[in-house]
Amino acid sequence: MIKNDTIAAIATPPGEGSIAIVRVSGPEAIQITDKIFSGPVPSFASHTAHLGTASHHGRQIDQVLLLIMRAPRSFTGEDVVELQCHGGYFSCSQILEALVSEGARPALPGEFSQRAFLNGKIDLIQAEAIQNLIAADNLDAFHIAQNHFQGHFSQRVQKISSLIIESLAFIEVLADFPEEEQPDMEVPEKRLNEALVIIEDLISSFDEGQRLAQGTSIVLAGHPNAGKSSLLNALTNRNRAIVTDIPGTTRDILEESWTLQGKRIRLIDSAGQRETDNPVEQEGIERAISAMKQAEGILWVMDATQPPPPLPEILFQKPSLLLWNKSDLASPPRIDTSLPQLAISAKTGDGILELKQFIQKWIQKQQLGKNSKVFLVSARHHTILQQIRTYLLSAKEGLLSQLPPELVALELRQALQTTGNLSGSEINETILGEIFSRFCIGK
């Protein structure tokens, strides 16, 4: 990529809309924009807005609002100009064509964020978070990406780096100045333990982060012909599952994504639980049992017109709700159990609103206090942190085994370099500065 040229691109999605935005960034952003704007752009103060017209070769394109942000006080760290025009395809595309003809280059995908990273406005973790913010399809995924973009994950990585550097400084004293008074070796071990605690906390958050981003899994289970598939269709407002009066119609796992008040839920319809000699149906039943074990919640659907069936033990091992379906045909019986119960009718919609409210409170309770926690969702981050952990554990073992300090320092340097892969920073030699700041070497 040419780092000193000026780029331009349409920043809003294509299609009809009230406003479209064309963004320009680079050393010539102001001069190039001045060639198509009606006002004196070079004289505009930073962070000001100006109403005017965009024209090219004597032809007016559109009335626009120009926003100017001078370097380094911009997203990319360069001079940035944004032109807000009427929405739709033609206005913004003609403005972009005019800018390109006057010297701007069409930006590559993600190039504005890449320049922000290269100019030190954001680190690599934050750059990745921008894409996750845009792609988020539920509130949990959005909150996780927002947390990363705000720098909370980066702060953890910086803390890990600082602890590694501090440990390495002590080890370098042993290697480079063996004749001097040796420092307390409990200090580097303590720093490594602190770093490992942070790393373990981040690594352990990966599965939970994946679950939050992908959605809470809830299984619809119960005996055959109780109305599980009808309930799936009623909740999602789609005819997704085949519904018949024949028991055992559902023989495989059917998953449907559903959004409830911004929360993504993976509804899983499963085969009815009963004794059967049919090998295909039996396979479906076993898959249903496996799905219940892996799910975060179970909706156990029962037929209100039938006697209460026995409840499987798994319902008492995770959040579960007993649903008496077909309440429009009969008054549901009550089971003497600690599990909550609700009467519904998937056919008429009775009780569906109450069920949605119950599920919403269910999820809110499970996720209480999690919005402020740092979760991993990237396999790249997860893999790198595992590598760092391996290096630090090896270094710690070397300390305890009193291996030569050069070998311990090698593991720590590997860990430090790998940590830089998270933030995208270049690893500089700062160990000598750390040593001089902590010890009077010549004394």
Curated annotation (Swiss-Prot):
GO terms for biological process: tRNA methylation; tRNA wobble uridine modification. It is found in: Cytoplasm. Mg(2+) binds at S229, T250. The keyword Magnesium applies. It comes from the Bacteria. Pfam families: MMR_HSR1 (PF01926), MnmE_helical (PF12631), TrmE_N (PF10396). Its main location: cytoplasm. One of its GO terms (cellular component) is cytosol. (6S)-5-formyl-5,6,7,8-tetrahydrofolate binds at R23, E82, K121, K443. GTP binds at residues 225-230, 244-250, 269-272. SUPFAM superfamilies: P-loop containing nucleoside triphosphate hydrolases. K(+) binds at N225, T244, I246, T249. Binds 1 potassium ion per subunit. Its EC number is 3.6.-.-. Residues 215-364 form the TrmE-type G domain. One of its GO terms (molecular function) is GTP binding. Its cofactor is K(+). Keywords: Cytoplasm, GTP-binding, Hydrolase, Magnesium, Metal-binding, Nucleotide-binding, Potassium, tRNA processing. Homodimer. Heterotetramer of two MnmE and two MnmG subunits. Belongs to the TRAFAC class TrmE-Era-EngA-EngB-Septin-like GTPase superfamily. TrmE GTPase family. Exhibits a very high intrinsic GTPase hydrolysis rate. Involved in the addition of a carboxymethylaminomethyl (cmnm) group at the wobble position (U34) of certain tRNAs, forming tRNA-cmnm(5)s(2)U34. This is tRNA modification GTPase MnmE. It comes from Chlamydia felis (strain Fe/C-56) (Chlamydophila felis).
